[in-house]
């Protein structure tokens, strides 16, 4: 049973990220005022509990808790379509920011997908370490309606890393923000900030990113190179503080991405500690965007982490940014290796 604890503001790193686009709608005004998307739902919440919670506000035409097609596990978000637009508005005002178990849910209108609202996500760097999320929003709000925002923080100290994301309602608003703020010094800043699109890279750009990541990894792990002839094992691809195989470098650096799964883009995370659990992956990847699923691979005997896990994110540019930021990241006494899951890993 889901226990309602309290109401509070939605946090950026609340677990699974925020999904806000409703595909397959016709974009009519009535639809846009009755369709809601609900993010950051507890993974053990059932369809019945989801319907009961939002049905307490008003008559529901339909609702759907989104699940993994293979495992049946909740992906942490769902859609609600009310009969009356007033009930949809009331649901946002009443339930947005509600704390359910360890999650704080976000309730908002599910915007129909259209060209005018795509690619409106900005990447901001060199922010003052003292700037918080609200102050960043105030800086950017003069250029348009902000849908989501977040500032990345150090997982240990909680101190800002000086990097943030701002998603505007429309691309043209994001363009104006770039024109107005890129290269400028906000109040309290010691250097100019960089503001640019965090767009989906092209296939060529994606391969270049992979090449860079694996060349960096290859430089980090020195020693003799050997061809890998045995059946692929995630543990053999990047052994901790040992030689990396030339097969994994050449194949992975030049490989075309396998494409998104039904749930999104799958990321391979290696060199986790035996004590690592799913919450560690949520905390690491949640700040970068919409995380739909995390899985730590455990030893059947000890139930301890075997050193690796997988994270699924819905958006390519957010997944790529997470990889670029977390590959080589020191977690405790370990250095993580983070990459897109490849076709070989799919077969493992």
UniProtKB/Swiss-Prot annotation:
GO molecular function annotations of the record: RNA binding
InterPro entries hit by this protein: ELAD_HU_SF (IPR006548), HuC_RRM3 (IPR034915), Hud_Sxl_RNA (IPR002343), Nucleotide-bd_a/b_plait_sf (IPR012677), RBD_domain_sf (IPR035979), RRM_dom (IPR000504), RRM_dom_euk (IPR003954)
Keyword Cell wall biogenesis/degradation among record annotations: no
Gene Ontology BP terms: cell differentiation; nervous system development
UniProt tissue specificity: Expression is neural-specific in both embryos and adults. Expressed from neurula stage onwards in primary motor-, inter- and sensory-neurons. Expressed in the closing neural tube and motor neurons of stage 18 embryos, and primarily in the ventricular zone and dorsal region of the tailbud and adult brain. Expressed from stage 26 onwards in the differentiating ganglion cell layer of the retina, extending to the inner nuclear layer at later stages.
Induction, per UniProt: By bHLH transcription factors atoh7/ath5 and neurod1/neuroD.
Keyword Signal set for record: no
Role this protein plays: RNA-binding protein that binds to AU-rich element (ARE) sequences of target mRNAs. May also bind poly-A tracts via RRM 3. May be involved in neuronal differentiation and maintenance.
Entry similarity comment: Belongs to the RRM elav family.
Record note on domains: RRM 1 and RRM 2 bind cooperatively to AU-rich sequences in target mRNAs. RRM 3 binds to poly-A mRNA sequences.
Entry protein name: ELAV-like protein 3
Source taxonomy: Eukaryota, Metazoa, Chordata, Craniata, Vertebrata
UniProt gene name: elavl3
């Amino acid at each position: 049973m889901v226990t309602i604890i309290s109401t509070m503001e939605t946090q950026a790193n609340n677990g699974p990220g925020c999904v806000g686009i409703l595909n397959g709608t016709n974009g009519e005004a009535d639809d846009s005022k009755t369709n809601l998307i609900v993010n950051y739902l507890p993974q053990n919440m059932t369809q019945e509990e989801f319907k009961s919670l939002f049905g307490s506000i008003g008559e529901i035409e339909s609702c759907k808790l989104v699940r993994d097609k293979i495992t049946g596990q909740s992906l942490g978000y769902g859609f609600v379509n009310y009969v009356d637009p007033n009930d949809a508005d009331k649901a946002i005002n009443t339930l947005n920011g509600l704390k359910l178990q360890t999650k704080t849910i976000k309730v908002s209108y599910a915007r129909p997908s259209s060209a005018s609202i795509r690619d409106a996500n900005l990447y901001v760097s060199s922010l003052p370490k003292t700037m918080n999320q609200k102050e960043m929003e105030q800086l950017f709000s003069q250029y348009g309606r902000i849908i989501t925002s977040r500032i990345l923080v150090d997982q240990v100290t909680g101190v800002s890393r000086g990097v943030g994301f701002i998603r505007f309602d429309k691309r043209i608003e994001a363009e104006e923000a770039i024109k107005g703020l890129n290269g400028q010094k906000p109040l309290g800043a010691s250097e100019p900030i960089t503001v640019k699109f965090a767009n989906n890279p092209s296939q060529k750009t994606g391969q270049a990113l992979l090449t860079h990541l694996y060349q960096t990894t290859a430089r980090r792990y020195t020693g003799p190179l050997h061809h890998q002839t045995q059946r692929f094992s995630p543990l053999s691809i990047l052994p901790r503080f040992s030689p990396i195989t030339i097969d994994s470098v050449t194949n992975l650096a030049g490989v075309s991405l396998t494409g998104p799964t039904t749930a999104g883009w799958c990321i391979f995370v290696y060199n986790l500690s035996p004590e690592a659990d799913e919450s560690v992956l949520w905390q690491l990847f949640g700040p970068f965007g919409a995380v739909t699923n995390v899985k730590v691979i455990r030893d059947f005997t000890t139930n301890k982490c075997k050193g690796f896990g997988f994270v699924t994110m819905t958006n390519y540019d957010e997944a790529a940014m997470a990889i670029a930021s977390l590959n080589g990241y020191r977690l405790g006494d370990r250095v993580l290796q983070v990459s897109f899951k490849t076709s070989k890993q799919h077969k493992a």
